[in-house]
């Protein structure tokens, strides 16, 4: 691969469970070594690679010889705890064939929620890459009680792409990409090769995972793509079993579904607001506030709030929703939930008289907000 012909310098590759198991109940080591070969070739060409890998629970089942366990959170975490060591060992052995070392990062939502921990994770990623070591990222399923759920590693890979300032995110799955209908049930379904905008009509095309081993579906890949492209990162969803898929995607061959990055990506802090903290509550906005926030780029004022949901403190990340429940923005609140319950719908000049203090007119300042 000719370095001068490669458009990307830092790539995140996400491998779903269905890709790693090839549809079986165990890791497909032969296919994993083929994927490792492609990533190693990129590294030799000067392209830095970050691997976000699923498969810990599948590896745990295999290592324990498929125990008959009740489908509980504790048992999923048991399998993840056993399987994670087997998974990282497998990758370390496979990459060693090509003279490469790996470093493991197990993350939870808490690592992304806290700004300092978020930046520390970024520094670790950059240090590994600077020393020609492949970072291997997975959700810390053994301790993350609300993280073993649909979409977790798809979204995690997008956040990893933001963390390391990647310019390409490759989501490899058991499908060839995004189709205009479900290809599993509709033989006339056509592959969508290019996406410039992710909207509600596109989200309706997404389906769920059918492997039974993974936690992601096409809808979560759209969520991940939307996060990444807002940060200026291109995204490709493609089949992990297409020959030389990683090499071909990086070479910009027409394969899978390509999502263009937005022209004016979010700056670093707004990337964190979008992808870091979990929303701790929501504010329901009237039509005027929705227009002011989404069309005029203004801060959210108390007058435009008609509902407060959740218990949260000042500085929490919130979702801003319209009266139909559609999320229109995310942002950091300057007032706690209890205070907002008292001043919602009131004019800004009434805040101090109602609360006895005033943190400013803006409930969510436009500089602390990401419009979706």
Curated annotation (Swiss-Prot):
Pathway: Amino-acid biosynthesis; L-proline biosynthesis; L-glutamate 5-semialdehyde from L-glutamate: step 1/2. Its EC number is 2.7.2.11. Substrate binds at residues 54, 141, 153. Disulfide bonds: none annotated. Residues 280-358 form the PUA domain. It comes from the Bacteria. One of its GO terms (biological process) is L-proline biosynthetic process. GO terms for molecular function: ATP binding; glutamate 5-kinase activity; RNA binding. PROSITE patterns: GLUTAMATE_5_KINASE (PS00902), PUA (PS50890). One of its GO terms (cellular component) is cytosol. It is an enzyme of class 2 (transferase). Its main location: cytoplasm. It holds the Pfam family AA_kinase. ATP binds at residues 14, 173-174, 215-221. It is found in: Cytoplasm. It catalyses: L-glutamate + ATP = L-glutamyl 5-phosphate + ADP. Keywords: Amino-acid biosynthesis, ATP-binding, Cytoplasm, Kinase, Nucleotide-binding, Proline biosynthesis, Transferase. Catalyzes the transfer of a phosphate group to glutamate to form L-glutamate 5-phosphate. Belongs to the glutamate 5-kinase family. This is Glutamate 5-kinase. It comes from Shewanella oneidensis (strain ATCC 700550 / JCM 31522 / CIP 106686 / LMG 19005 / NCIMB 14063 / MR-1). The lineage of its organism: Bacteria, Pseudomonadati, Pseudomonadota, Gammaproteobacteria, Alteromonadales.
């Amino acid at each position: 691969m000719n370095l001068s012909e490669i458009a990307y310098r830092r790539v995140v590759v996400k491998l779903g469970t269905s890709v790693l198991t090839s549809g079986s109940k165990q890791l497909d080591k032969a296919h994993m070594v083929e994927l490792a070969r492609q990533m190693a070739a990129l590294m030799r060409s000067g392209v830095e690679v970050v691997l976000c890998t699923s498969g810990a629970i599948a590896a745990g089942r295999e290592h324990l010889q498929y125990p008959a366990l009740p489908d509980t959170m504790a048992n999923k975490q048991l399998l993840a705890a056993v399987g994670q060591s087997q998974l990282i060992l497998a990758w370390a052995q496979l990459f060693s064939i090509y003279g490469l070392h790996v470093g493991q990062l197990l993350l939870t939502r808490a690592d992304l929620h806290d700004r300092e921990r978020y930046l520390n994770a970024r520094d670790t990623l950059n240090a590994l890459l600077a020393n020609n070591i492949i970072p291997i990222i997975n959700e810390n399923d053994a301790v993350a009680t609300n993280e073993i759920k649909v979409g977790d590693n798809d979204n995690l890979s997008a956040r990893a792409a933001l963390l390391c300032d990647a310019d390409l995110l490759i989501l490899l799955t058991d499908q060839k990409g995004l189709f205009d209908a479900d290809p599993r049930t509709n033989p006339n379904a056509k592959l969508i090769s290019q996406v410039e905008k992710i909207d509600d009509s596109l989200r309706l095309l997404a389906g769920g995972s059918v492997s039974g081993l993974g936690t992601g579906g096409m809808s979560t890949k759209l969520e991940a793509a939307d996060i990444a492209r807002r940060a200026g990162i291109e995204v490709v969803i493609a089949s992990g079993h297409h020959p030389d898929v990683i090499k071909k995607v990086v070479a910009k061959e027409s394969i899978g579904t390509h999502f263009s990055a937005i022209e004016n990506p979010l700056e670093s802090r707004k990337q964190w607001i979008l992808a870091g903290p979990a929303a701790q509550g929501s504010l329901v906005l009237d039509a005027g506030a929705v227009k002011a926030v989404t069309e005029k780029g203004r801060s959210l004022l108390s007058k435009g709030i008609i509902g407060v949901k959740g218990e949260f403190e000042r500085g929490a990340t919130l979702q801003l929703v319209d009266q139909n429940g559609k999320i229109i923005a995310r942002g950091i609140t300057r007032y706690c939930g209890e205070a907002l319950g008292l001043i919602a719908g009131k004019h800004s000049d009434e805040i101090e008289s109602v609360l006895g203090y005033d943190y400013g007119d803006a409930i969510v300042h436009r500089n602390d907000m990401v419009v979706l």
